[in-house]
């Protein structure tokens, strides 16, 4: 019984150490989008944007609104590309 408890404790410790080693640093964490808006959102509501990370199942742009909401959008849509260009110019 003591051997099995020791083995279990050892395995749990290994699992925790392994999961911590595979995590990305907090500064590199990105949010993934699983759905995106289909309608254009008003540009006046948008403060900035970021792209989803490489590990996400689908590519998306995440717009941050002035009220603090995050809205996912399809980067292939023309209005999304125009918003990105505008926001990039404003940040220069």
UniProtKB/Swiss-Prot annotation:
Localization per record: Secreted
Extent of the signal sequence: 1-21
Molecular-function GO term, any one: heparin binding
Alphabetized InterPro entries for the sequence: Chemokine_b/g/d, Chemokine_CC_CS, Chemokine_IL8-like_dom, Interleukin_8-like_sf
Pfam families registered for this protein in UniProt: IL8
Record-level GO cellular component terms: extracellular space
Tissue expression per record: Plasma serum.
CDD domains in the record: Chemokine_CC (cd00272)
Keyword vocabulary terms for this entry: Chemotaxis, Cytokine, Disulfide bond, Heparin-binding, Inflammatory response, Secreted, Signal
Main location: secreted
Protein name, entry field: Regakine-1
Source species of the chain: Bos taurus (Bovine)
Lineage: Eukaryota, Metazoa, Chordata, Craniata, Vertebrata
């Amino acid at each position: 019984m003591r051997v099995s408890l020791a083995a279990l404790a050892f395995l749990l410790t290994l699992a925790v150490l392994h999961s911590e080693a595979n995590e990305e640093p907090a500064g590199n964490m990105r949010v993934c989008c699983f759905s995106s808006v289909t309608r254009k959102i008003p540009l006046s509501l948008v403060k900035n944007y970021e792209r989803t990370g490489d590990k996400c199942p689908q590519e998306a742009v995440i717009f941050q609104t002035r009220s603090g909401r995050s809205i996912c959008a399809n980067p292939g849509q023309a209005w999304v590309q125009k918003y990105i260009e505008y926001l990039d110019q404003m940040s220069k």
